From Swiss-Prot:
The species this protein was found in: Renibacterium salmoninarum (strain ATCC 33209 / DSM 20767 / JCM 11484 / NBRC 15589 / NCIMB 2235)
Gene that encodes it: trmD
SUPFAM superfamilies xrefs: alpha/beta knot
Oligomer and partners: Homodimer.
Keywords noted in UniProt: Cytoplasm, Methyltransferase, S-adenosyl-L-methionine, Transferase, tRNA processing
Family per record: Belongs to the RNA methyltransferase TrmD family.
UniProt enzyme class: transferase
Protein name according to UniProt: tRNA (guanine-N(1)-)-methyltransferase
Length: 263
């Protein structure tokens, strides 16, 4: 996979040189290029922003440097359009499913906006050469797109074959099956007067699997009930449904619903 990141603060992306993503780059599992947007300006001050038409606070990123920067990363002979991700609080909310979609692509480009954002004409212009996906990390505002891009790059790149040492670990993480991950424990089994759940010492793999599944369901119901409404009850077994009933959920018209919301 090839990834290109465009930013006015290329040094901000230095953490991508570390840990698993940095090692994946060294091992040739992914190609990651960081570009300085100011290198595509044409004035001596290397200006990348200007005042907004219509008035208002802040500055807007100029279109021409962005057009030149984006054009520089397009491969004319590519079989498919690269995906252009534009971090924006007005974009679709990034999640694990989107990370999986992006991990299946061959070329991703990330446009790190600053100030009040990038001139909207750039987004429209880019659609001819890119599949454009404005993307948000959540319902809050950051100073720029770099933090969001680092999160999205890591969430996506770690799904590539060979990046994570044990691929089975990817199957047991939060959100992989639409639920939060179960709690985990390590040695010692007794710590400051607190013991780990006894079932984890039983050696009974079926009981351990059931315990972990139950904890996933309880934790999701407590912390992220919104995820349960997106879950297909058809994939749940009787034990799953029993745990959810204890947590205050029933299946109504094919949707998991809080019992407190029923008349």
């Amino acid at each position: 996979m090839r990834l290109d990141v465009i930013s006015i603060f290329p040094d901000y992306l230095a953490p991508l040189e570390l840990s698993l993503i940095g090692k994946a780059r060294q091992d040739g599992l992914l190609e990651l290029n960081v570009h300085d947007l100011r290198a595509f300006t044409t004035d001596r001050h290397r200006t990348v922003d200007d005042t907004p038409y219509g008035g208002g606070a802040g500055m807007v990123m100029k279109p021409e440097p962005w057009a030149l920067a984006l054009a520089s990363v397009v491969e004319p002979a590519a079989k498919s359009k690269p995906v252009l991700i534009v971090p924006s609080p007005a974009g679709e909310v990034f999640n694990q499913r989107i990370a999986e979609e992006l991990a299946a692509e061959s070329h991703l480009v990330f446009a790190c906006g600053r100030y009040e954002g990038i001139d909207e004409r750039v987004v429209d212009w880019a659609r001819e050469s890119f599949t454009v996906r404005p993307m948000s990390l959540g319902d809050y505002v950051l100073n720029g797109g770099e933090v969001a891009v680092m999160a999205m790059v890591e969430a996506t790149a770690r799904l590539l074959p060979g990046v994570v040492g044990n691929p089975d670990s990817l199957l047991e993480e939060s959100h992989q099956d639409g639920l939060l991950e179960y709690p985990v424990y390590t040695k010692p089994s007794a710590w400051r007067g607190v013991d780990i759940p006894a079932v984890l010492l039983s050696g009974n793999h079926a009981k351990i699997a059931r315990f972990r599944r139950d904890e996933q369901l309880r934790r999701t119901a407590q912390r992220r009930p919104d995820l349960l409404t997106q879950l297909d009850p058809a994939i749940l077994d009787r034990a799953d449904l029993a745990v959810l009933r204890e947590s205050g959920y029933l299946t109504v018209d094919g949707v998991l619903t809080r019992t407190s919301e029923l008349g």
